[in-house]
Amino acid sequence: MNMYQLLERTAQTYPDNLYLVREGVKYKDFIDLVKARAASLDKAGVKKGDVVGILSHNIPEFPISLFAIWYLGGTVLLLDTNLTPFEYDNMAQITECKLVCAEKAFVYKTDKFEFYDITKKDGKVNPDLKPAAVESLDIATMSFTSGSTGMPKVVPLTHFNIVECTNSLESMAEWIRPADILYGFLPMYHVFGFAVEILATLHFGAGVLLQPSINPKEIMADFKIFRPQVIPAVPRLWEVFRNKIIDNVKAQKKWWLVSFVLKYGKTLQKIGLGALVRKVQKPILDVFGGRARLLIAGGAATKPEVETFYERLGLTFIQGYGLTETVGPICISKPTKKRLPFAFGGPTLNNECEIRDKNEDGVGVLWLRGHQVFGGYLNNEEANKEIFDERGFFNTGDMVSMDKNGELHFAGRKKQVIVLDSGKNVYPDELEGMFITIPGVKNVAVFEHRVKDKTVTYGVFSVEDGMTIEQLGAEIANANKKVASYKWVTHFAMTTEDLPLTSTQKVKHHVVRQNLINGMYPDRHE
């Protein structure tokens, strides 16, 4: 089965379910829009085997063009909207992409490829244009994972990989139902947004409410009007939502009551005070529209206190793990009473894992094998030899451990692990998760750095206006007491500027480190 056939199956099963919620487009109508776009692209010269780029925010024409390209048997090059013309030109050359479906705001003069206006109105469906004969092992998408200049890594994913990922999402059937509304503000060019906004909706016959903006006012208005049942977001956004909710409650001088009810809600319900619990929860749940059932986090580890906050509101909170190389979610947690903080579950259907080279703490490198794992980077045999073993297992480069329940825990990227002069390993994610709870700290990057010919664990902190280097130092010293002394951060810099982030709100550690070297963070304690 290929991806267009999967769309056809969903449209036949749920023809009258809304797919594009804001636009009121049902699955049966979406099929016609795809066929009309396919006819337009066919006239533009797109044929089976061609690589066609999509450069767009989350607008309806994105999924319409996506499936239209697949209808014609093409490969979709998913392009990050935050790059430069030079990078797009290079990407097109590497992948032999000759046409890019783009919003007008991204169009520029180039001789590397042609632009196609993604918002252009399509004509009628061409009844003579049939779906291309696409095999399951044909390449469906390409994405860049390590930059677009120098020696980039391009991830080709087959229709088989993506269909299998879609099928594996059945593990979420307890929480996602046909006709649910899934909020879609994660960029669809990124594998997390692609997996939940395209694949999950397709599998369950659910609808997606696309939102091209990350403006909080627009998002809150959407929650109020459309009342989505499923909301995916990166952990950083879940933390921002939580903090704003708490600040609003404190401003009303009601935090003492809310915090008490959230902490003892189950006990209060058992003694007949369920009405009080619901009364306290309701205005908070109304922030998300009042119908939210499932919150999904991915792209990084979620702090336990953030996850606990939402679960005490009666919401189901799921943590997933995945990479571009695995079509996103290849591990999904299941919320149970036994589940430990930071757990992101185990491999999904038809996938398996091994943890190799464990240290004394049980932390080792995660290797994966299965139907969702890609076949190797495009035209990069050297890299492929390094990441695949003779048994077909893929080296993720991520450090994980397994708890007593058999669930995995993220410890950090192997390439970001700090190796001290003593030989001890320090995992930045562990320390960042600890430091981010310091009042006044907006974000933090921990990495390896040389100070006076010594390898140290260095931290760069983004803080609120008014915090002094002395105050921050005292908070860091207090936090350090929670971990072994060799992990302590005693060298750090402070800035009131935001740290550079990726499109999925992850800190760009390499950029922060280079900024430090370039003297951009003068407030230092070394």
Q: Where would I find each of the regions flagged by the language model?
A:
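AMP-binding/adenylate-forming catalytic core of the ANL superfamily
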Residues: V100, G370, G375-G376, M399-S485
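Conserved AMP-binding/adenylation subdomain of ANL enzymes
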Residues: V163-I181, V191-P283
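Conserved AMP-binding A3 loop
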Residues: K26-K28, A140-T166
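Structural core segment of the AMP-binding/adenylate-forming
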Residues: L20, A44, I64-F67, Y71-E135, ...
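Conserved C-terminal "lid"/linker of ANL adenylate-forming enzymes
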Residues: I418, A445-R450, A477-E526
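Conserved pre-ATP/AMP-binding loop-to-beta segment of ANL
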Residues: N126-F144, M151, W175-I181
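Conserved AMP-binding/adenylate-forming
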Residues: I231, L276-L408, K414-V417, L431, ...
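Conserved AMP-binding/adenylate-forming core of the ANL superfamily
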Residues: D16-G45, D50-I59, F67, T84-D89, ...
